Amino acid sequence: MKLTINKNSAKWMQLPRDVLVGHGVLEEIGDVCRDLKMKGNALIVTGSTTNNIAGKRVSNLLESAGCSAEMVLTCKATKEEVEKVMEKALEVETNFLIGVGSGRSIDLAKLASTRLELPFISVPTAASHDGIASSRASIVDNGRSTSAQAQAPIAVIADTEIISAAPFRFLAAGCGDIISNYTAVLDWELASRLRNEYFGAYAAALSRMAARVIIECADSIKPEHETSARLVVKALVSNGVAMSIAGSSRPASGSEHMFSHALDKIAPKPALHGEQCGVGTIMMMYLHGGNWQEIREALKKIGAPVTAEELGIEDRYIIEALLHAHSIRPERYTILGSGLNPSAAEKVARITKVIN
């Protein structure tokens, strides 16, 4: 039998080479750098709060390991801040970057390192979303939140002692981001059937598995428990791997994420990304004809928001976000199709008890 090879089917997948999850693993950052042959000048990208939580420790540990460490403090995930990080990296002749934070700093390090063609290490201080290990970065450009393609971290060092000490709201938001995989994969399957879009069964299965684990363990995810932090971090890393395998954010981002991004634009005070995605998943699962009650119950058990009131967002903004969600990424086909009308948007929000 003759084997025919399609040369155009090759795909480049970037995955983290070292992933450390556990109590006190931050102390091993020097060993990770040696293992990955990373030496010379490191640039630590962090915020003022996360610098006190872990940034200064990372700097001291790197210097003890024979690396010099410079630091740049950031405040927002904007295009201008990416340029600021890049300028600092060039100024100090950086060999690699380290993002230390709950999301913003990691995304900035991710984008800056990608553009500079330098490796970067992800050191999350909270487990609030799957950006800690993915090849995607959320950035604000001209006042609009966008998802940009970048490189995956060469290593992830997730110290559960630090992560479990963060406000539990962040961990609960991370659970919402993971559970949203369910509707993301359903949207992906729909696009494959109706628009002949590429569908990766392996990436989809990995994504679904992460969501299923969180739902089945919802009762045991508690504040200040390192076992809870470890469980959520591993699922978030799985999300990042699934996206890298797929070559897009499809396994972990669908209509529920478009709803969240619409809320970011519309609501005066948006909630956390993962919180909004969790609520969006309840409604999008209803539209898919799936078990939205299971999603809602799991989020409630964890302590994540399931209503507009719990998000701190007025009902009218929920409806408006539902009406505009399909236009956030018009090239990405989802259950929202060409959009909901006002009556349908209100109906889904009321039936799923997101609004009263």
Curated annotation (Swiss-Prot):
Keywords for this protein: Cytoplasm, Lipid biosynthesis, Lipid metabolism, Metal-binding, NAD, NADP, Oxidoreductase, Phospholipid biosynthesis, Phospholipid metabolism, Zinc
Sequence positions that bind NAD(+): G103, R104, S105, I106, D107, T125, A126, A127, S128, S134
Sequence positions that bind substrate: D130, D177, H261
Binding site for Zn(2+): D177, H257, H273
A GO cellular component annotation in the UniProt record: cytoplasm
One GO-annotated biological process of the protein: phospholipid biosynthetic process
Cofactor: Zn(2+)
Superkingdom of origin organism: Archaea
EC class: oxidoreductase
Pfam families: Fe-ADH_2
EC number: 1.1.1.261
Magnesium recorded as keyword: no
Cofactor comment text: Binds 1 zinc ion per subunit.
Protein's cellular compartments: Cytoplasm
Pathway info: Membrane lipid metabolism; glycerophospholipid metabolism
GO molecular function terms attached to this record: glycerol-1-phosphate dehydrogenase (NAD+) activity; glycerol-1-phosphate dehydrogenase (NADP+) activity; metal ion binding
Catalytic activity reported: sn-glycerol 1-phosphate + NAD(+) = dihydroxyacetone phosphate + NADH + H(+); sn-glycerol 1-phosphate + NADP(+) = dihydroxyacetone phosphate + NADPH + H(+)
UniProt-listed PANTHER family: GLYCEROL DEHYDROGENASE (PTHR43616), GLYCEROL DEHYDROGENASE 1 (PTHR43616:SF5)
Similarity annotation: Belongs to the glycerol-1-phosphate dehydrogenase family.
Function: Catalyzes the NAD(P)H-dependent reduction of dihydroxyacetonephosphate (DHAP or glycerone phosphate) to glycerol 1-phosphate (G1P). The G1P thus generated is used as the glycerophosphate backbone of phospholipids in the cellular membranes of Archaea.
Protein name in UniProt: Glycerol-1-phosphate dehydrogenase [NAD(P)+]
Organism for this UniProt entry: Methanosarcina barkeri (strain Fusaro / DSM 804)
